[in-house]
Amino acid sequence: LIDYYNYLEKSPPRTRLSALAVDMAYYGPEGCLTEERRELIKVYRYKKEQELQNVVKSVKLFNVKGYAFAIAYAKSLVSGTQAANRVIENVKADVYIIVKEDGGLSFRRDKKSTINLVPLANIFGGGGHPYASGASLNGNVSEKDFEKISEIIYEKIKNNWTP
């Protein structure tokens, strides 16, 4: 429900979040689920699933120095981790890059891969862990801009990354 309010309502009324918190404290998690709230959860789950399907459809593949990269676009409804997990389930690659609507970059690797993702994230001013890293682009990225942004990312990796 909190995700519904945060992601699907452009200006979430704090009173709805406050009421949810009070109801959860008083009635417990199950007791606070009114029919209206159950419907909101269904709507959120449906829209989230649609967005995850769109993430997979947006995948572009490229190869750098013998390694397969999959890059995909995700709107703010899903996290970089959720988007990456869905792409990993559906696309074979060594490295997965999720470009978020807010300009965030999420790097993940295949479980069998030994590629250290930190140097990749460093190219974009980010960091993290060898298996999961992140960075940020300057500004938001629209679906329309994704093609151009993915080409820029490819060029930066091709010219600056040493496996």
Features from the language model and the residues they span:
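Glycine-rich, Lys/Arg-enriched anion-binding loops that position phosphate/diphosphate groups
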Residues: L1-T81
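Gly/His-enriched, cation/cofactor- and phosphate-binding structural elements
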Residues: K48-P163
